Amino acid sequence: MSRTIFCTFLKKEAIGQDFQIYPGDIGRRIYDDISQEAWSLWLNKQTMLINEKKLSMIHHEDRALLEREMIQFLFEGKDVHVSGYIPPKD
């Protein structure tokens, strides 16, 4: 059974996460306030960051960078910018 939450990212009612997908207090905040749709948008941005910046999840600094970018994207309204990336034209 899916849960409906008010997604603070999308600013509308949406289907919430099925379980806490990230550890700690940030994970609880994501579970409570971020919809599946918004999380999917973040995962696309995360993949772009990992690929373009050649991040490795083995390195603590790279994981910390991703977490900072995730918080800024999901909770502070800041988009992810990757130098050299040009979005496709519609």
Swiss-Prot record:
Biological process annotations from GO: cellular response to oxidative stress
GO CC terms of this entry: cytosol
SUPFAM superfamilies xref list: YggX-like
Keyword vocabulary terms for this entry: Iron
Leader sequence segment: none
Gene Ontology MF terms: iron ion binding
Function: Could be a mediator in iron transactions between iron acquisition and iron-requiring processes, such as synthesis and/or repair of Fe-S clusters in biosynthetic enzymes.
Similarity comment text for this entry: Belongs to the Fe(2+)-trafficking protein family.
Subunit organization: Monomer.
Entry-linked HAMAP family: Fe_traffic_YggX
Official protein name in the record: Probable Fe(2+)-trafficking protein
